[in-house]
Design a protein with these regions (language model features):
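RNase H-like, Mg2+-dependent phosphodiesterase core
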Residues: 1-304
Length: 304
């Protein structure tokens, strides 16, 4: 979907303008419009006649789902009719992870079961991929909504750095370890919802890597992997729960260290690692960080 039109009332027009301003859209003059704005390759124009909004660009579908519906119209129906996208609303597990690319902190993997009723509820609540949510408070608020949804099933595992490093020494490959984690979560969800026929995850490796991990746990269901899997509501909900567990650990680690433990693998991360080692010795690093990262060598001069 690269174009969409929807009617708005006066209050929704005002609300949409405020939302666009908050998201950093650039407003431009355009004939016959109340206002017109653009950001990247997305254009949003509200026309006087109607009034109605015209959304154009490759991010049209995301804008409808993550901005227009939850923040402006309050109706989760635009472009998501169940007839047009039955798999989105059919019973399935969605799996996602958080912390994979961060030197500090755990690898958190979460799974969520959804069906048609649950999916409609989550869309209306504004559930979206955690990477689109900018604050920890918002992540926690959305996570609470997910957990309180009637009929939902979910599971989250957090591989704290000590356990992560132990497992990595065994697997010696991040994708195989991720597959084991995904399979572990799917196994628990299958215990809760044994009739669920399908699981969906973001594609992080060849399909056979995860299929092999599932076979080792005697799990038989249809597995789908795709890029941008988080566009699926179940996967998006899983991303929120995984992120919540990750930021909770990072907050606790910051308190324990006595200074901010940063995200990512930046120079600030290296500085924080050196500060930890200076205060507590190099052996403490394995309690805070993923030691196979090249960042370890930058911190200690050695690659574990």
């Amino acid at each position: 979907m690269t174009s969409h039109t929807a009617p708005l009332n006066a209050a929704q027009v005002t609300k949409l303008r405020a939302v666009l301003e908050g998201q950093g859209f650039e407003f431009v003059a355009k004939e016959y419009t109340i206002f017109s704005a653009k950001k990247g390759k997305l254009n949003v124009s509200v026309y006087e006649k109607g009034p109605k909004v015209l959304i154009q660009g490759k991010d049209t579908e995301d804008f409808i789902r993550f901005t227009l519906e939850p923040e402006v119209t309050g109706e989760a129906k635009l472009g998501y009719e169940e007839i047009a996208d039955p798999e989105h609303f059919s019973p399935h597990f969605g799996i996602d992870e958080s912390g994979k690319g961060d030197f500090f902190g755990p690898l958190c993997i979460a799974g969520v079961y959804t069906d048609a009723e649950i999916t409609r509820h989550l869309i209306k609540a504004g559930i979206m991929d955690s990477k689109r949510v900018t604050s920890a408070a918002a992540i926690r608020k959305l996570a609470a909504v997910i957990k309180a949804t009637p009929g939902i099933a979910f599971d989250v595992i957090a591989l704290r750095p000590e356990k992560y490093n132990e497992l990595y020494a065994t697997f010696k490959n991040l994708n195989r370890m991720l597959a084991w984690g995904h399979a572990t979560v799917i196994d628990e969800l299958a215990r809760q919802k044994p009739d669920c026929p399908r699981a969906l995850s973001d594609q992080f490796a060849r399909a056979d890597v995860l299929q092999t991990a599932l076979k080792k746990k005697n799990i038989c269901l249809k597995l789908d992997q795709r890029t941008k899997g988080e566009s699926d509501t179940a996967v998006a909900a899983a991303s929120i729960l995984a992120r919540e567990r990750f930021i909770d650990w990072m907050d606790a680690a910051t308190k324990k260290a006595g200074f901010t433990i940063p995200l990512g693998c930046s120079s600030q991360v290296v500085d924080a690692g050196k500060k930890l080692v200076a205060a507590h010795g190099s052996e403490v690093l394995g309690k805070f960080a993923k030691l196979h990262f090249k960042t370890t060598q930058q911190v200690t001069g050695e690659l574990f």
